[in-house]
Amino acid sequence: MKRFWKDVAVAQADGGWAIELDGRPVRTPARAALLLPNRALAEAVAAEWTSVGAEIDPRKMPLTGLANAAIDCVAPEREAFAAGLARYAEADLACYRSDWPPELVERQGACWDPLLAWARRRYDVDFATTSALSHVPQPPATVQCLSHAVAALDPFRLAGLSPLVTIGGSLVAALAVLEEAVPPEDAWAAVSIDERWQLEQWGADDDAEQALQNRKRDFLAAARFLKLLS
């Protein structure tokens, strides 16, 4: 789709902050009003619309995409959406370790142990870790507590949390980013450690490297979305 507007503005409206293109409010793909919960996020979304060139490229508008998802996809099914993310507590990436080679074992421990330690302190839970290939059950109290933490989130925070969880495979790392307990770049380093290790060992493959960079872009965009909500 070609750009059809000249001016972009942020306007306060009933229920939030709207984005206006030449004075007309933006709507989501489902035709709902695109209303943002605070001015900071609204201005960041407006900046994406301002920066659009001759053609609209949704890949360059991640905040808009997450806001659309919050309104169109998450809000109507908030409880079910939260439950889907909470299931990652049953098999968090940080609980599955390599046992060889020693350098990878050390790297995983250096990245993942602090995340689990933070979650233990924050939620008063414990974790079972393993280096086996089979699933290791987590304590029911841990799964329940983390599930409650996710269930308490509003649709916008759930929309922002979702890419962190699904891209990284770690609910613990995603919650740590949400609560600003770890910088997003550090969280990305933790959840991408295995892929980066493989690239180091076997050499860079252009497609694999690009895929990793795309995932990093989406991960950090989601982290920024959450930061703007705080």
Describe the function of each predicted region.
Residues 137-206, 220:
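An internal, amphipathic alpha-helical element
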Residues 37-40, 76, 110, 166-167, ...:
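Conserved active-site and cofactor/substrate-binding residues in soluble primary-metabolism enzymes
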Residues 209-230:
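Long, charge-rich low-complexity segments
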Residues 49, 53, 119, 123, ...:
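Structural signal for hydrophobic packing residues in well-ordered secondary-structure cores
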Residues 1-76:
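An N-terminal structural lobe/cap that precedes and organizes the functional/catalytic core
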Residues 79-145:
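Internal, conserved structured core segments that host functional sites
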Residues 58-61, 131, 203:
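Short coil/turn segments at secondary-structure boundaries
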